[in-house]
Regions:
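Conserved beta-strand positions in the central sheet of alpha/beta enzyme cores
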Residues: 54-55, 106-108, 132, 156-157, ...
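Glycine- and other small-residue-rich loops at beta-strand/loop junctions that grip anionic moieties
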Residues: 64, 84-88, 108-111, 158, ...
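Hydrophobic positions in alpha-helices of CheY-like receiver
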Residues: 75, 79, 122, 126, ...
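Hydrophobic, well-structured mid-protein blocks that either form specific transmembrane helices
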Residues: 93-139
Length: 197
């Protein structure tokens, strides 16, 4: 079935990423340089034909987390495109707040020990279609294959090198995060992947 989907190469989604720290857009999880006005940036994404924005909440405490959720809510009020968010999710209430803030889906972090149990509860309460998982290694998928299929609607792959293994381990759809945009590299990698299917 994935080969059929890949053959519809005209179907592409362009997904932007946004990192929030203290209610402001920053360059990355490791670079806290402010990127300008977060609302203008999201409006630019909205007006540029981006299909979805994935927001990473980089908060380290509850007050900052609330500030970032408030920012996400304001973003969702002012743009038309879909928003998914994750980061600092420690309770079912955090999932609820992000969904109520207008997020289409909530992203859980596979590297966090409590994520699977919490995601399972969130999936049961809010629906599997609202729950995503960010992953960066194949071991997690191998160890939790059945739970992934049952709990998560989609995977956010943070390491492009695991795609081949991912194809053999799960039928769960995925989005690949690419920290740098190089259209030639992306095209070559996807052509190679399609040929393998």
């Amino acid at each position: 079935p994935r080969k059929e989907v890949c053959n519809l190469i005209g179907f592409k989604n362009i997904v932007a990423t946004l990192y929030l720290k203290n209610g402001q857009a920053v360059k990355s999880a490791s670079d806290m340089t402010v990127m300008g006005d977060v609302y203008n940036l999201c409006q630019l994404y909205n007006d540029s034909g981006i299909d979805k924005i994935i927001i990473f909440d980089l908060s380290t405490d509850d007050d900052e987390h609330e500030k970032n959720i408030h920012t996400i809510e304001n973003i969702n009020r002012n743009i038309d495109i879909k928003v998914c968010a994750g980061g600092n999710i420690n309770r079912i209430e955090d999932v609820k707040k992000l969904l109520y803030a207008g997020c289409l889906q909530v992203i859980f972090n596979a590297t966090k020990d409590s994520s699977l149990e919490l995601a399972n509860a969130a999936s049961e309460k809010f629906g599997k279609d609202k729950i995503l998982l960010s992953i960066s290694n194949v071991d997690y998928i191998f160890k939790h294959q059945e739970e992934i299929e049952d709990t998560f609607h989609e995977l956010l792959v943070l390491n492009i090198d695991i795609i081949d293994a991912l194809e053999n381990l799960t039928s769960t759809p995925y989005v690949v995060y690419m920290p740098q945009f190089d259209i030639d590299k992306i095209t070559t990698q996807w052509k190679d992947l399609i040929e393998k299917l």
